[in-house]
């Protein structure tokens, strides 16, 4: 059964298992989410739910986004996300979804987030390209190097690794394990590291791979 959740990255810490081994975990505040809309095969051609996350003042939303909440008379939400699920019969508009409703300890999940932005960077930092000599009068240290032949083909090939914007990309880490779910504080402890800065928005889904 497909499961999905929105969350906010809190940070990393470590816990001990029953054998006394240290487990590095990332703490994620998952939900609570509010069901804003239900989509069905009859009306939309597929089954899905649209959820909202983090209440926000009306003045901070655009008119199109506000319109989605005015129809259902729900409080405005900062984030809206649609999840296609196999069975939406258990969800109703206005219903609150908590972390414990979706995931349990031992579940395998995929986590997607936006990586930290690094700005404009050169090829050494962006791709790990080797630097030139630092001594003996060399003027070539962290430069690009050759970008191709001159006369033939006389152009730079597509995909050539060049300086440019680094980071701020959607990254998905697959097959992570849920170590613990704190239902009182809506926290999920996930084994290992996940992308994004502290406070970054995350999409958590049950894994698409078996992990064998």
Curated annotation (Swiss-Prot):
Transmembrane ranges, per UniProt, are: none
Q: Which keywords appear in this protein's UniProt record, sorted alphabetically?
A: Ribonucleoprotein, Ribosomal protein, RNA-binding, rRNA-binding
One matching Pfam family, short form? Answer: Ribosomal_L3
Q: Which InterPro entries match?
A: Ribosomal_uL3 (IPR000597), Ribosomal_uL3_bac/org-type (IPR019927), Ribosomal_uL3_CS (IPR019926), Transl_B-barrel_sf (IPR009000)
GO molecular function terms noted in the UniProt entry: rRNA binding; structural constituent of ribosome
Question: Can the keyword Zinc be found in this entry's annotation?
Answer: no
Check the record and name the SUPFAM superfamilies matching this protein.
Answer: Translation proteins (SSF50447)
UniProt-listed GO biological process terms: translation
- Which GO cellular component terms are attached? cytosolic large ribosomal subunit
Gene3D superfamilies in the record: 3.30.160.810, Translation factors (2.40.30.10)
Q: Which PANTHER family match?
A: 50S RIBOSOMAL PROTEIN L3 (PTHR11229), LARGE RIBOSOMAL SUBUNIT PROTEIN UL3C (PTHR11229:SF16)
Q: Which family does it belong to?
A: Belongs to the universal ribosomal protein uL3 family.
How does the annotation summarize its subunit structure?
Part of the 50S ribosomal subunit. Forms a cluster with proteins L14 and L19.
Tell me, in a sentence or two, what this protein's role is: One of the primary rRNA binding proteins, it binds directly near the 3'-end of the 23S rRNA, where it nucleates assembly of the 50S subunit.
Q: What is this protein called?
A: Large ribosomal subunit protein uL3
